[in-house]
Amino acid sequence: HCISSAASDVYKRQSLARILTKALNCRNLIEGEPCNDCDSCSEINAGSSIDFQEIDAASRRGISETKELLETIPYLPTSSKYKVYLIDEVHMLTKESFNSLLKTLEEPPPHVIFMFATTEFEQIPPTILSRCLQLNLNSVTVEGLVEQLSKIFSKEKIKFEKSALDL
């Protein structure tokens, strides 16, 4: 339930998160691709989805902000299958923030997906990284990314159409 990606380009990190979120939550996949028309896709495209939260850890890195996020975890998604939390620049979180995330990462609710984006994997505690699939977007090919995501979704028993992952 956690994907960690590294890329120097913020656009790559955020685009990947949006594409995956739409692929996971689209109600009307068209030949395996998000329709970009259903409520879920439209809300993600407009940046107004309650079920897709983007957090900038560079400015919201403290324990109080992390606890605030964790308080929302038990609530089911409002209009999507999954609630997705994108924490960009995750390596900026404090030690206390990482520790508070650990229990949720160890026992994630079935309706929650975390996406951690960073420029520096080495700054993330090993206890956190060991619970995430790690994708280095600086050197990954599209085919390699699709293959890795297919493995993860299969392992996590997340239903998907492989063609939805073909970027």
Question: Where are the model-predicted features located?
Answer:
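Non-catalytic interfacial helical region
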Residues: S5, D56-L167
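Short cysteine clusters
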Residues: K12, C35-C41
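Conserved beta-strand scaffold positions in the cores of enzyme catalytic domains, especially
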Residues: R18, F52-E54, Q134
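Short, conserved catalytic or adaptor-binding loops enriched in Gly and charged residues
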Residues: C41-G47, T127-I128
